[in-house]
């Protein structure tokens, strides 16, 4: 650590303000970033302040995301606070992040990625295949709903908004017989035992950037840039470069069922992607391999290949 860097480290008198949503999972993620920075720079807990910011997506629970504004509903107020100087960094679940950041902000720091798989959660059924004909399944994810409709068109799919705890309570109340959650979130909350088990990616390709935590900052803040460089996980960044370029080319939002996963194999990246009709009547999968250095171009190329196979009105 340089002497200049030492003078700019957070301290109890000038703590680093970490902006986050207020759900238990979001708070865990914010504190994980704090723990990583404490370990990397030998800092006390008092050198940080976690700032909870209410976002529209958490306040409106009775409507589908696509009907009230999509992914930006989970980030807009936090990014406004970052731009206004009310916080110094913002911690996000990357699968909730729009592909483009507002002018003045950059997202270039990621923690090591967690389990990317979806989890099958049901009080009374062990596997998806064991659900009876016509069973009610809750999900707010267009991707999961389309993938389920493709594999099990007999299922009744109902909207299932809310944080992990809210959705588990809905299951207990009998609103649905099963739901799907990200294994990463369950692992982080110490709730992995609530899942019947993970669903392998060959059966259900996950959301782009699922399991990844991203840290957003102001472009002009060189002090924070130096701090975050000390905890950035390069391999996760490389994987997300491919996945988010894939999503960007597809104009991905909460209105389009898109799945994608990049895996590093030696000096290569293997990117798998899938686009689906919202009603689950058609899926167009694909995959490409290429050098890690070309990760973003790989994502763009795979998206173009899938779009070329999609008929007009595919996402409608």
Feature-to-residue mapping (PLM):
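Extracytoplasmic loops/domains of multi-pass membrane proteins
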Residues: 73, 81-83, 92, 97-102
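Short, well-ordered beta-strand segments
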Residues: 17-19, 51, 90, 108, ...
């Amino acid at each position: 650590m340089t002497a200049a860097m030492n003078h700019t480290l957070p301290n109890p008198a000038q703590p680093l303000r970490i902006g986050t949503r207020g759900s238990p999972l979001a708070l865990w993620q914010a504190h994980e970033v704090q723990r990583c920075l404490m370990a990397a720079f030998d800092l006390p807990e008092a050198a940080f302040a976690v700032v909870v910011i209410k976002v529209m997506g958490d306040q409106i629970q009775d409507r589908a995301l696509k009907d009230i504004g999509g992914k930006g509903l989970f980030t807009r107020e936090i990014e406004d606070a970052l731009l206004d100087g009310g916080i110094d960094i913002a911690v996000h679940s990357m699968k909730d992040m729009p592909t483009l950041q507002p002018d003045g902000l950059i997202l270039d720091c990621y923690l090591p990625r967690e389990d990317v798989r979806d989890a099958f959660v049901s009080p009374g059924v062990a596997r998806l295949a064991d659900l009876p004909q016509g069973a009610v399944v809750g999900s707010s994810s267009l991707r999961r709903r389309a993938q389920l409709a493709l594999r099990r068109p007999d299922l009744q799919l109902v909207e299932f908004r809310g944080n992990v705890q809210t959705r588990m309570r809905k299951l207990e109340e009998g609103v649905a017989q099963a739901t799907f959650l990200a294994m990463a979130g369950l692992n982080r909350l110490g709730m992995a035992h609530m899942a019947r088990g993970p669903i392998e990616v060959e059966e259900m390709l996950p959301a782009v950037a699922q399991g990844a935590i991203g840290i957003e900052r102001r472009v002009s803040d060189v002090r924070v840039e130096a701090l975050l460089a000390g905890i950035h996980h390069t391999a996760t960044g490389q994987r997300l470069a491919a996945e988010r370029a894939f999503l960007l080319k597809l104009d991905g939002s909460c209105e389009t069922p898109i799945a994608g996963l990049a895996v590093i194999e030696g000096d290569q990246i293997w990117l798998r992607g899938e686009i689906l009709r919202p009603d689950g009547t058609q899926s167009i999968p694909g995959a490409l391999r290429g050098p890690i250095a070309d990760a973003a171009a790989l994502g763009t190329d795979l998206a173009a290949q899938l779009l070329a196979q999609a008929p007009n009105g595919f996402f409608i």
